[in-house]
Amino acid sequence: MALEKLGKALNSALRKLARSSTVDEALIREVVRDIQRALIQSDVNVRLVLQLTKRIQERALNEKPPAGVSPREHVIKIVYEELTKLLGKEAVPLEIREKPTILLTVGIQGSGKTTTIAKLARHLQKRGYKVGLVCTDTWRPGAYYQLKQLVEPYNIEVFGDPGEKDAIKLAREGVEYFKDKGVDVIIVDTAGRHKEESGLIEEMKQISEAIKPHEVILVIDGTIGQQAYHQALAFKEATPIGSIIVTKLDGSAKGGGALSAVAATGAPIKFIGVGEKIDDLEPFDPKRFVSRLLGLGDIQGLLEKIEELQKEQEFKEEDVEKFLRGKFNLKDMYAQLEAMQKMGPLKQILQMIPGLGYSLPDEAVRVGEEKLRRYRIIMDSMTEEELENPDIINYSRIKRIARGSGTSTREVRELLAQYNQMRKMFKNLDKRKLAKMAKKFNFGGLGI
């Protein structure tokens, strides 16, 4: 998860409140000190930290909780509200209004810009937009091929010419090419060869003049911490139509510093990079982000992931009928495991469920993910007949499946036991409830 170390430290501070029988001044001061320490270790600017914790302490000591809210709950709410303000208060979504909408992306060398552009293209494609990418990076020889390789599996086209040295010419031609193709969104990638803001902004102005983008997006490396302030400020002052993506938040100890520094400039953060996979780009919503960070969950985010799966996997009425008759086989179970993996890492999903964020040890989550992966390998070694009718799987078949999948007979038996448990559960479910759940969660994919 993005800022996991910071999240665990903040969650630990709030647990002191939960475990205490009374909330007094001494406890509030102790919790505030813990929050200060956690934020400073995440490279948040000391002045910002002191301002934030002063507000938390003053409010916690002076405000009376509303009727029906315990002092403990009220302090947690104050921490949540103040952290949300630190990271920008409200979400600012990316708007696609015109066809085509032209997005120009810029970033300092090593910011992860090319990978982020591929992620953004995939994000928009999943929301129904036809996207075209224009590579104007004439500086780095492999840039065009890297971008092409990242998006080719998703049928997203890249316009570029590794032999052309004129970036502005490439930008103009690429935009015209995709306009003729009738795409919804054109994303223009720039060189990213600059090591400081001044060169970057000069290039941005030149290409902006040539293609007139609807929005300019600055990609900032989250590992630089509070140094992000200067980049974001220079960028904000140079363009009135700018927004920001902060990358590499999954493994950075300084991510909190980067996010808070950018938010302090007033420049809108629209996305954050939370992993290496192409789907690891999230729209940034301070409220939901802080909720997950504190271990309070993100139900809305979980529902959105489920809806994405529903769009990707066509819902069929006969699938529901099959479940209603108890006709659940290993093929259906395989589809469910596939869908779970599409939702993202198990740890990321658990952090969206209130109370589960930091309660499971990392080792338990890792074992769970590994088990799901091995179940799929085992099913890949089964015949079509065995997947359709698991009841025919006897001991000699179990031995063959274990041999073919490089697993043990114990693991194959464990998978079959899990399958039988799920089948039994479906048979015992109330038929009307099952129909309702099937329509809500799409049994062709995620299931329940």
Curated annotation (Swiss-Prot):
Keywords: Cytoplasm, GTP-binding, Hydrolase, Nucleotide-binding, Ribonucleoprotein, RNA-binding, Signal recognition particle
Gene Ontology molecular function: 7S RNA binding; ATP hydrolysis activity; GTP binding; GTPase activity
Protein name per the record: Signal recognition particle 54 kDa protein
Organism phylogeny: Archaea, Methanobacteriati, Methanobacteriota, Thermococci, Thermococcales
Family matches, as InterPro entries: AAA+_ATPase (IPR003593), P-loop_NTPase (IPR027417), Signal_recog_part_SRP54_M_sf (IPR036891), Signal_recog_particl_SRP54_hlx (IPR013822), Signal_recog_particle_SRP54_M (IPR004125), SRP/SRP_N (IPR036225), SRP54 (IPR022941), SRP54_GTPase_dom (IPR000897)
Chief place where the protein resides: cytoplasm
PANTHER family per UniProt: SIGNAL RECOGNITION PARTICLE 54K PROTEIN SRP54, SIGNAL RECOGNITION PARTICLE SUBUNIT SRP54
Catalytic activity, EC: 3.6.5.4
Gene Ontology terms: cellular component: signal recognition particle
Positions contributing to GTP binding: 107-114, 189-193, 247-250
SMART domains: AAA, SRP54, SRP54_N
UniProt organism field: Thermococcus gammatolerans (strain DSM 15229 / JCM 11827 / EJ3)
Domain remark from Swiss-Prot or TrEMBL: Composed of three domains: the N-terminal N domain, which is responsible for interactions with the ribosome, the central G domain, which binds GTP, and the C-terminal M domain, which binds the RNA and the signal sequence of the RNC.
Superkingdom of origin: Archaea
A Pfam family assignment: SRP_SPB
Cited function: Involved in targeting and insertion of nascent membrane proteins into the cytoplasmic membrane. Binds to the hydrophobic signal sequence of the ribosome-nascent chain (RNC) as it emerges from the ribosomes. The SRP-RNC complex is then targeted to the cytoplasmic membrane where it interacts with the SRP receptor FtsY.
Listed GO biological process terms: SRP-dependent cotranslational protein targeting to membrane
PROSITE patterns: SRP54
Record-linked HAMAP family: SRP54 (MF_00306)
Family: Belongs to the GTP-binding SRP family. SRP54 subfamily.
Cell location: Cytoplasm
Class in the EC hierarchy, top level: hydrolase
Reactions mediated catalytically: GTP + H2O = GDP + phosphate + H(+)
Oligomer and partners: Part of the signal recognition particle protein translocation system, which is composed of SRP and FtsY. Archaeal SRP consists of a 7S RNA molecule of 300 nucleotides and two protein subunits: SRP54 and SRP19.
